[in-house]
Amino acid sequence: MRKLILLCLLLSVSALAQNNSSFAQQRARHLRRGINLSEWFAQVYDPKGYTKEHLVGWVTADDVALIKSMGFDHVRLSINPAPMMHHNEADRIPGDYLGYLDGAVKMVLDHGLAVILDMHPDSDFKAKLVQRDDEVEQFSDFWRALAHHYSTYDPEMVYFEILNEPEFRDRYRWAGVQAKLAAAIRDGAPKHTIIAAGANWSDIDDLLELTPLSDLNVIYNFHFYDPHTFTHQGATWGENYWHFETKLAYPAEMHNAEQVASEQPDRLNRLRVLRYALDHWDANRIAVEIGQAAEWAKHWNVPLTCNEFGVYRRDSDPQDRARWIHDVRATLEHDGIGWNMWDYGARDDGGGFGVVNGPKEGPNTPDEVTVQALGLKH
C-alpha cells in the first residue's frame, strides 16, 4: 500500500511539473512581438519626479492603440519600485501610486495587449541588493505584495519580470537572490508566469551561466545589443568612445570602420572601432550569437524571450539601423524566441531607440523604416 501511495504521489508531482512547464511554454506564445514602454513608471529623471501629470499623460490610450495597430502583441512596462517602497514597510504599497499603475495596466489590457511588469530600478537600488540581505528581504516583501495585488488578473495576459539587468557580478549570489524573489512572487500569485534572467546585464553570456529555477512556470529572457560599438554609437553614456562615433555601417565594412576610427581621440578607442569590422558583424554573426541562447533554452527545455534589443538612433544611419534590427528580429523568430524591442520612444524627439517619431508635443507617429524592419505593418 505504501508503495502504491508513493507511486501515486510521484505521478502527481510529475504531472504537476509538466503542467507548470507547459503553462510557461504556452504563455510564451503570447509574447512574440513586443515593445518596451520606458520613461513612464521608470527612468524618470525630471526633478519633479513621478508626478500625477507625468503618470497619467506620458503614454496615452492613443499610444497604446497605435502599438496595437502596428502589430505588437504585448508591452514590457518598466517599473521603478523605489517610489512605491517605504523603508521597513515594503509590503504596504501606496494606494495612490498603485492606482496610476492599475490604470496603465488596464489601458494596455483593454487594447488586447499582454503586459510584462518589468521591475526596472536604478543602479543604486540594485547595488543595495548586491550588498545587503535586508534590502533583498524588503524587495521580496514588495514583490510578494505587488504580485498578490495582480493575482486576480488574467495570468495569460499579465507577467512578472523579477529584475531588469541585475548588475550582480557574483552570479552565485544572484542565483540565490533571484530564487528568493521568484518564491515571493509565487507566494503572491500562484498561477502567474515569472520571467527570469542571468546576472549582471542579462546578456547571452549571463544566460549561458544560468541554471534554471526549480519553479517551472518561468520564462527566461536575455538582452541583445551586440555589438555595442554599432548599437550605441553616439551615446553619451557608457563607453567614452561611443560618443565620437557616427554613421558606423552595418553590416560591418572595413573602409567605413577606418573612417569612423579616425575620429577617435586615442589609439585604444580606434582599435575598438576597427575590431567591429574585423569581427565581421553581419547577419551570420548575429545568428551565431543568438543561436547560443537558443541552444541553452533547448538544453534546459525552457521558453525564452529577448526582452530588449535596439539601436540608438541619433548618430546611426537609418537604413543600417533597420538592417541590424531586421537581422536580429529575423534570427529570433527563426529560433522560436519571442522579442521585445527597446523601445516605443514616446516624446524622445526621434533621437533615442524608438519605433515612433516622438515629438515633445503632439501625437507619436510610426517610424516606417523601423516598423518594416520588425516585420510589422501599419
Where are these regions (language model features)?
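Positively charged n-region of N-terminal signal peptides that target proteins for export
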Residues: M1-L4
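Active-site region of glycoside hydrolase catalytic domains
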Residues: S21-Q25, L31, E137-D282, A287, ...
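Hydrophobic h-region of N-terminal signal peptides that target proteins for export
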Residues: L9-A17
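Structural motif corresponding to alpha-helix initiation and N-cap regions
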Residues: G57-A61, A287-I290, A322-I325
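Hydrophobic beta-strand scaffold residues
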Residues: V115-L117, L304, W339
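Active-site mouth of glycoside hydrolases
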Residues: S22, R27-T193, G198-D206, N217, ...
